[in-house]
Amino acid sequence: MTYVPDNALYNVSKAGVVTLTKTFARDMGKHGIRVNAVGPGSIPTDLNAALYADPQKEIELCNKIPLGRRGTKDDIANCVLFLASEESSYLTGQVIYAEGGWLLV
């Protein structure tokens, strides 16, 4: 997890998701309930469209992502499908960061 400068409320909400995920996973595990979360990277949405309307800004962003591209809604959906499947039956309390390596930079 990283932080966004000058945006304390956003940062606190991200940290809250991580803490709630771990807390609920521990509390609900005894009932056989798994609790995980997805931390999406830069995914084009209506909320951030204006930020990257300039093609040069889009290129600059993609150059900072090790996989060289922004994620898609399908990338996030596939991560959620995995977490909802039996293939992840031994995962709980985890935040899966689907962000193309952004946090490695």
Give the predicted meaning of each segment.
Residues 21, 77-80, 84:
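Short-chain dehydrogenase/reductase
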Residues 65-76, 87:
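A conserved structural motif in NAD(P)-dependent oxidoreductases
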Residues 49-65:
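A short C-terminal helix-loop "cap" of Rossmann-like NAD(P)-dependent dehydrogenase/epimerase domains
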Residues 1-16, 21-30, 43:
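Catalytic loop of short-chain dehydrogenase/reductase
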Residues 102-105:
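Short hydrophobic/aromatic patches at helix-to-coil boundaries
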Residues 5-6, 30-33, 54, 63, ...:
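Short coil/turn segments at alpha/beta junctions that flank glycine-rich nucleotide-binding fingerprints
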Residues 18, 39-50:
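Short, flexible catalytic-loop segment of classical short-chain dehydrogenase/reductase
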